[in-house]
Amino acid sequence: QRHFSDIPNKKLEMPVYSDSLFSNKEVPKFHHVESVRDRDVLKISFDMPDDMPFWESKPTQFLAHLLGEEGEGSLLSYLKGKGWSLGLETSTWWRMFHIKVQLTDLGKEEYEDVIRACFSYIQLLKEEGLKNYIFEERKKLADIELKYIEPKSSMGRASQYSASMLYFPVESFLSHYYLYHKHSQEDFEKFLSQLHVENMQVS
């Protein structure tokens, strides 16, 4: 406020983008790209609603955590057990959610089975929901991470934080940005419901 209070607030309305990224039926579901690296990656991408208004429950972060787990019973452990995958990661950016699977030679041949396995695991999440103990674990870890937050470039942090301040209360910005404030099964299911075949692209 000390540095920016002289800038007039024009109270402009935020633009709303309601069209689905993958709603056009003429857009191919599958894209094959020759890799310049010595590895093959299967990427399943989903169009998602804007998750910033859901900062209290952070549903996309739980989706990324649950689908990206590496322990026993995880999606990755199943794919590795089949000899299809060397690694898996999830990511979110704006209105996109990605599942990236690093394929073995066998996984490349049987990529359709890899996709089916991903959707089987998504169905399992729909049946089980977001369990309270998982929320509490992530909540405690976030508390610790904020307490011992690693320094990063001032420019990068300023850009990241200033954009997020459109959604978070300025007075308690950091806690709202990093921490989990409520366990919402409804929010989790809202975003989980977007992970379906009609709403995906594969590359």
Label for each model-derived stretch:
Residues 1-203:
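Mature, solvent-exposed C-terminal subdomains and processed small-chain segments of exported/organellar
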